[in-house]
Amino acid sequence: MPAKIHISADGQFCDKDGNEIQLRGVNLDPSVKIPAKPFLSTHAPIENDTFFEDADKVSFINHPLVLDDIEQHIIRLKSLGYNTIRLPFTWESLEHAGPGQYDFDYMDYIVEVLTRINSVQQGMYIYLDPHQDVWSRFSGGSGAPLWTLYCAGFQPANFLATDAAILHNYYIDPKTGREVGKDEESYPKMVWPTNYFKLACQTMFTLFFGGKQYAPKCTINGENIQDYLQGRFNDAIMTLCARIKEKAPELFESNCIIGLESMNEPNCGYIGETNLDVIPKERNLKLGKTPTAFQSFMLGEGIECTIDQYKRTFFGFSKGKPCTINPKGKKAWLSAEERDAIDAKYNWERNPEWKPDTCIWKLHGVWEIQNGKRPVLLKPNYFSQPDATVFINNHFVDYYTGIYNKFREFDQELFIIIQPPVMKPPPNLQNSKILDNRTICACHFYDGMTLMYKTWNKRIGIDTYGLVNKKYSNPAFAVVLGENNIRKCIRKQLSEMQKDAKSMLGKKVPVFFTEIGIPFDMDDKKAYITNDYSSQTAALDALGFALEGSNLSYTLWCYCSINSHIWGDNWNNEDFSIWSPDDKPLYHDTRAKTPTPEPSPASTVASVSTSTSKSGSSQPPSFIKPDNHLDLDSPSCTLKSDLSGFRALDAIMRPFPIQIHGRFEFAEFNLCNKSYLLKLVGKTTPEQITVPTYIFIPRHHFTPSRLSIRSSSGHYTYNTDYQVLEWFHEPGHQFIEICAKSKSRPNTPGSDTSNDLPAECVIS
């Protein structure tokens, strides 16, 4: 079974003996954001109220994966050398029928998914992700069930009329099934995150994190809505965890499930806004209809407003022609009659001061309608805070304390993964009771230029993290020029994120990039016609370059089993999947079979002894071994490898140190010249060296018979079954460089193509 993961004194993942390990994998699978029955992708048009009326009757079974297909998907991931899965699930999938009404059939399906993953070639490490985007599917994203919006007094059926949220579903022609109008006129690229700045999402997050402070009148069944929502959310998560342990305790005992992440990409809502009558200067994303908070309040009450519109330009977001929105009598809030019916259905009893058919921020005196018609903002600074850290160090910590305590009551040894808001440092928890030695910090990173423009710009890049965190006196200083500098800038950003996280949580807490990736529908989906994924390859290689330089573990966003060239990941026009069934016919693998070893020419370049599982050589770490009960004469996972359907495979398939007998110092894979450099500090041991460093060396880049290896010390064995190099090196500072020798220009001594490194290795 997979070995238990430990954390070293300097915050690195390691085994029980202190040998550092690296976690690499994917998010599997974004289909969990949408129901499977009925299949309700975001390109399913909303034609009538059944979208809302039947929301409590949906089922998510078969999302993330159809059970019978699990083995083939996991073998594909193992073909990349991956050992880790981030398994998202949504609150809606667990509790869509109503508060406390759990879908145990779906939970049991998840148990079966986990069990089947664990049975495939020794399984994978898996951690659970309570996923959300802009609060809910009904506010333009994914996550919370519909009843949470009703709980806040919202009428989601009127979000379109009041601009309280933008849903992709409203921009689909029911007759043609296609989007209405041109992309930038109807549903612009990456417009869905603007919901974070619209009435529905901002209100829900404000209530979730700060309801007791900002909405004291909003109590339900004797609880403030903050406690009510957090309690239901945490209970749903822990009910799933308990169900897994009840039905399949071996998933925990075998180190298959390694931990739980806190809420995906939490948001502060209105908390911290200093003036509700203006768009905050620090807001970098302005696209499409962009109301101020006060304008959102008015629109939610059915009041006509003229608001700013922004469009995407080469130089950023530019203000365009204002537009007037007339809700035509519709409100974003439940009428008295509607709310009475909802409250009766869910057995809710509200505070008598909580009036229906009215904005809750008007209810709390933030604004009012004077003389029966004129809206007036009374408290523009109602949500302001003394400094920008108040939310993360107070409101967020209050929430995190709740889930931390519940999870630690459930299990003391599993990892708990704390995730702060996107591109922001975590709270300062040093010396806190809710920071223990099984805590990990989650970071997410997407290159701003690549994400928003869906292209790989080799000329201009932006230090997104530095810009968001005000590390520049002038935004112009965040601009970088040239592809090499852009790559270095991304590496610097990831390093800064790690540094900032450790400054808040301490050096002993590992940093794990639980989401990082690129859009594949670049350049208006040109690659889907030409099969030229060079832009995607360059963008992904830049991320790989950045991650491996700092020994950062990661799970790419994402692997989507239902991806298509037309609709991408079937959610809000996102297309991040590294694999697509539509790309399977385009792949012809000429390197899938294990090559027959050839003797290396005599030279100062070290030769490599190859072995198979029959040879009795030292085996790779447990999570890439074949099952103990599997006949070793049978094909191993890598010999079954299936690389068809992967996009930008050259950049995804990378060498990396699976387990280091010592401590990591530096690594770099050069995709252009097919070379890999690893520097480490070998562990000092009094005995003869018997424990190697294991390095995944994929045949896709490195044909075993043409490996050129130089190192500072030691000898090696290459296991062709597993594509793993076992390097037995000396203690202290060591390096190894592995190159793929060109057929046309063999790497002979003294040639221009060789890299002269200080020492030769012992030939095994």
UniProtKB/Swiss-Prot annotation:
Annotated positions of the Phosphothreonine modification: 594
PROSITE patterns according to UniProt: GLYCOSYL_HYDROL_F5 (PS00659)
Disruption phenotype: Resulted in the accumulation of ergosteryl beta-glucoside (EG) and fragmentation of vacuoles.
UniProt cross-references to InterPro entries, sorted A to Z: GH5_C, Glyco_hydro_5, Glyco_hydro_5_CS, Glyco_hydro_b, Glycoside_hydrolase_SF, Glycosphingolipid_Hydrolases
Keywords on record: Cytoplasm, Glycosidase, Hydrolase, Membrane, Phosphoprotein, Vacuole
Cellular compartments per GO CC: cytoplasm; cytosol; fungal-type vacuole membrane
Molecular-function annotations in GO: steryl-beta-glucosidase activity
E.C. code: 3.2.1.-
Keyword Cytoplasm: yes
Active-site feature positions: 515 (nucleophile)
Cysteines paired by S-S bonds: none
Catalytic activity as recorded in UniProt: ergosteryl 3-beta-D-glucoside + H2O = ergosterol + D-glucose
Family: Belongs to the glycosyl hydrolase 5 (cellulase A) family.
Name of this protein: Ergosteryl-beta-glucosidase
